[in-house]
Regions:
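Conserved catalytic core of nucleotide polymerization and phosphodiester-bond processing enzymes
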Residues: 1-177
């Protein structure tokens, strides 16, 4: 979809679908991002979720590969690797080693049951209420954490590479020079 082309009116809908569905979101995520306010109906939402997932098989496979790696690392206390991302359990912590070598850390992870009756991972951290609590997660959410962290690492690399420039600031993934 071209930004100012014939079908540019579809751009915002596509952007919402990417942001809502890219990390495992479904109908609820689409609604919370304003899909119904953009003219989509309730009946449009599940087919949109299904179509997005069918159109992005490598992303959805990556979600569940990460999910399996996290769960087996926690339950079997073994190291795992998925596409250059390493998972290890040590001293009551789940560590995810990024390609940069930086570690993401999850405190006291364990396997529990989610609200849908399926298996999920929980760990301790600061939740939405700003209090220390158990936080539920799963493959797509871990992928979101990994992608955001790798993006930060790339931005930092770019900032070091451009150290000869006067960097005024940065917003999301853009540097202001």
């Amino acid at each position: 979809v071209e930004k100012h082309g014939i079908n540019s009116h579809l751009r915002q809908k596509g952007k919402i679908a990417e942001l809502a569905l890219g990390y495992g979101g479904s109908i609820g995520a689409l609604k919370s991002m304003g899909a119904l306010d953009m003219g989509l109906t309730e009946d449009d939402l599940q087919p949109l979720v299904d179509a997005w997932r069918m159109s992005n098989p490598f992303i959805t496979k990556f979600w569940w590969d990460i999910d399996r790696a996290v769960k087996s690392t926690i339950t079997q206390r073994i190291q795992n690797e998925v596409r250059g991302i390493n998972f290890m359990y040590k001293s009551g912590m789940l560590f995810i080693r990024l390609p940069s070598g930086r570690l993401l850390s999850y405190v006291k992870p364990k396997i529990g049951e989610n609200k849908f009756g399926g298996e999920s991972v929980t760990y301790e951290g600061i939740g939405a209420t700003k209090k220390w609590e158990r936080i539920e997660s799963y493959g797509p959410k871990f992928v979101e954490n990994i992608v955001q962290a790798v993006s930060r690492d790339i931005l930092c690399y770019a900032m070091r590479t451009l150290s000869h420039c006067f960097i005024v600031g940065h917003v999301h993934d853009e540097l202001i020079i």
